[in-house]
């Protein structure tokens, strides 16, 4: 009985993502006086690999160039965690997070960089305990302007250097 209860609890991780996405109230960003720069948020994520049903644990770095709408800083993490709860592949997760951030903010300039460890690499097959997978999705200015891309990647390096351990 205890094992069945635990199994059901672990499966909730996958099912919970089908609950409605958390509300991300947008605020006007008055372009003439508003924030025009890049924002980069670091969010811890946990997911389940849809291929092997093994845990995935990592960090999402979400970059955005402010548009006409802003959302609260915690909303970036809420969106990333909500997207990650669904059983998915890391490559798909990048796109889903970018899509949801674009919807919430109205910005076409979004970058999502994921860095994660996968139970399917650690617990199965090769048993690679130090394996780390990195994936990136860049849209708008993050793709078109090398300076924007560099600023995003430099911000990630700084956050990795100063992140709590």
Name each model feature, range by range:
Residues 10, 115-119:
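A glycine-rich phosphate-binding loop feature that marks nucleotide/adenosyl-phosphate handling sites
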Residues 1-14:
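Single conserved hydrophobic/aromatic residue that forms the stacking wall/gate
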Residues 119-120, 128:
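C-terminal binding/interaction regions
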Residues 9, 53, 101:
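Conserved RecA-like P-loop NTPase ATPase core
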Residues 131-165:
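C-terminal helix-cap and adjacent tail motif
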Residues 81-115:
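Well-ordered alpha/beta subsegment
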Residues 19-81, 131-136:
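Active-site-adjacent structural patch at catalytic or cofactor/ligand-binding sites
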């Amino acid at each position: 009985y205890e094992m069945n209860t635990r199994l059901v609890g672990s499966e909730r991780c996958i099912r919970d993502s089908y609950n409605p996405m958390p509300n991300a109230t947008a605020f006007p960003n008055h372009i003439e006086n508003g924030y025009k720069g890049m924002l980069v948020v670091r969010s811890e994520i946990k997911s389940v690999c849809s291929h092997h049903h093994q845990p995935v644990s990592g960090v999402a770095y979400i970059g955005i160039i402010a548009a006409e709408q802003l959302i609260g800083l915690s909303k970036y993490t809420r969106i990333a965690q909500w997207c990650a709860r669904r059983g998915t592949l890391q490559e798909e997760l990048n796109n889903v997070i970018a899509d949801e951030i674009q919807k919430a903010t109205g910005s076409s300039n979004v970058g999502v960089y994921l860095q994660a460890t996968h139970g399917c690499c650690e617990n199965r097959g090769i048993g690679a305990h130090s394996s780390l997978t990195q994936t990136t999705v860049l849209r708008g200015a993050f793709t078109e302007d090398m300076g924007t891309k560099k600023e995003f990647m430099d911000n990630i390096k700084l956050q990795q250097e100063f992140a709590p351990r």
